[in-house]
From Swiss-Prot:
Protein name, UniProt field: Thermostable carboxypeptidase 1
Domain Peptidase M32 residue range list: 6-499
Species classification: Archaea, Methanobacteriati, Methanobacteriota, Thermococci, Thermococcales
Activity vs pH: Optimum pH is 6.2-6.6.
Span of the annotated motif DXRXT: 248-252
Pfam families hit by this protein: Peptidase_M32 (PF02074)
Cofactor(s) required, per the database record: Co(2+); Mn(2+)
Cofactor notes: Binds 1 cobalt ion per subunit. Can also utilize Mn(2+) (in vitro). Is not active with zinc ions.
Length: 499
């Protein structure tokens, strides 16, 4: 395999970066183990260990020798695209790491730890007042973070860019304008015409964990997931994907004992994330350009498998025999029943319970509030009422308690302001990629029906996966499909699927 890193300065950078990579590798293992294996009381020592490793990594990244090498590389003109990618990713990491003074980092860490505890108590007792003062502190920290990072148009831009490189408030505004104008009337029509149900008896059917474990393993085997050689499937409270490297990617799912589509769609979703990591160019091993380029692009891969494939008629018909074989109650249901059950549409208070059509309105609500938090004089006390008003306007339902409204997500307690829009970016891009993949694979649906997933995986590898983090998200998309993100594709997909 041809060596892609030729430049001597880049080779020096990568030799030093290997230690930073190794610390990240260890942190991934500790993070995965915390969710999957660690006994509850191990949390104190684990958090100290993770904190110390973060400090070590930060020191190595900002070591004068390392920073000087990256600065030197920025001035080089004869670099290839891979080497330019290395410089871009590291320069960005150094810029962000340098932006925050040590005392600010410490303040954020302490505040979010205490805020998370306050949020847990507030949610359990359905008492917003217990979280309110902490949310005011989080808002204040977010404003300060934006000032440290710097921005051209508005403070929220700086926070968006942390999670999705190059994303601006105007981009998010544009995508939500399309969804409000075109998706909202579609949602009303879907609910009115009732082609898909608002509820289904399969939601209440109970299952034994081992039944669904067999189904999930069968699905992953059909997808060609390299279990045992390069991948693992485990169980955690909240499904997630973590990569220790290109040859070690791990996913988790959950088994709740009812509503079996949740475990299937969680597994399929995480497979999409894992595939992105597994299909990277192996020459990127131990370098900063290994790994998905952004949260939004990553989410587009998981949503592609979950929504475009996992909720399709062809996929449901493919898995129906194995469902029937493993779930005794399935003899009462047809493939059409399962398809309708997989595609229920109903407004729900809880974002994580939302269906494909209503989900993005949950994100729109959070985007509007976050933008106000960071840009204007808005206090935490104003948020519950604003939340409820917006929920009623968008989905026609009004939360009756804080836990199904303002207190439902942990993100703000963690200080993650600017994160939510990446979920919608992923959903919109998944539909856009679908219409582009259909141009190259016109019999896409037939391939899914026959479990011929290799051509689909190869297309995703060629267009998205193999590039790792070489290009920023917008540039990667332009190279992959020749256009910018366009919310119209998702509107079209919803229309064709649900009406």
């Amino acid at each position: 395999m041809e060596e892609v890193f030729q430049n001597e300065t880049i080779k020096q950078i990568l030799a030093k970066y290997r230690r930073i990579w190794a610390i990240g590798h260890a942190q991934s293992v500790l993070g995965w183990d915390l969710e999957v294996n660690m006994p509850k009381e191990g949390i104190l020592e684990r958090s100290v260990a993770q904190g110390e490793l973060s400090v070590l990594s930060h020191e190595l990244l900002l070591h004068p020798e390392f920073v000087n090498l990256v600065e030197k590389a920025k001035g080089l003109e004869n670099l290839n695209e891979y080497e330019r990618g290395i410089v871009r990713v590291l320069d960005r990491s150094i810029r962000i790491a340098r932006a925050f003074p040590p005392e600010f980092i410490r303040e954020v860490s302490e505040t979010t730890s205490l805020a998370t505890k306050a949020w847990e108590e507030a949610k359990a007792k359905d008492d917003f007042s217990k979280f309110e003062p902490w949310l005011d502190k989080i808002i204040s920290l977010a404003k300060r973070a934006a000032e440290y990072l710097g921005y051209e148009e508005e403070p929220y831009d700086a926070l968006l860019d942390l999670y999705e490189e190059g994303l601006r408030t105007r981009d998010v505004e544009k995508m939500f304008e399309v969804l409000e104008k075109k998706l909202k009337p579609l949602l009303d029509k879907i609910l009115e015409e009732g082609k898909v149900p608002r509820e289904h008896p399969l939601e209440k059917e109970k299952y034994e964990r081992e039944w669904m474990e067999r189904v999930n393993l069968w699905i992953l085997q059909k997808f060609g997931f390299p279990l045992g050689t390069r991948a693992r499937l485990d169980v955690s409270a909240h499904p997630f994907t973590t990569e220790f490297g290109i040859r070690d990617v791990r996913i988790t799912t959950r088994y709740e004992g009812y509503d079996f589509r949740r475990t299937i769609l969680s597994t399929v979703h995480e497979f999409g994330h894992a595939l992105y990591e597994l299909q990277q160019d192996e020459r990127f091993m131990f370098t900063p350009i290994a790994g998905g380029v952004s949260l939004g692009i990553h989410e587009s891969q998981s949503r592609f498998w979950e929504n475009i494939i996992g909720r399709s008629k062809e996929f449901v018909e493919l898995i129906y025999p194995v469902l029937k074989e493993n779930l005794p109650f399935m003899s009462n249901y047809t493939p059409e029943d399962v398809y309708l059950y997989f595609n229920i549409v109903r407004p729900d208070f809880i974002r994580t319970e939302a269906d494909v059509v209503t989900y993005n309105f949950h994100i729109l609500l959070r985007f509007k509030l976050e933008r106000l938090m960071v840009s204007e004089e808005i206090k935490a006390k104003d948020l519950p009422e604003m939340w409820n008003d917006e929920m009623e306007r968008l989905l026609g339902i009004r939360p009756r308690k804080y836990s199904e409204g303002i207190l439902q997500d942990i993100h703000w307690a963690h200080g993650s302001i600017g994160y939510f829009p990446t979920y919608t970016i992923g959903t919109l891009l998944s539909a856009q990629l679908y219409y582009h993949i259909k141009k190259d694979i016109p019999d896409f649906e037939e391939k899914v029906a026959k479990a011929e997933f290799d051509p689909i995986k190869a297309w995703l590898r060629e267009k998205i996966h193999r590039w790792g983090s070489i290009y920023p998200p917008k540039e990667l998309l332009k190279k992959a499909i020749g256009e910018d993100m366009d919310a119209e594709y998702f509107v079209r997909w919803v229309k064709e699927k649900y009406l």
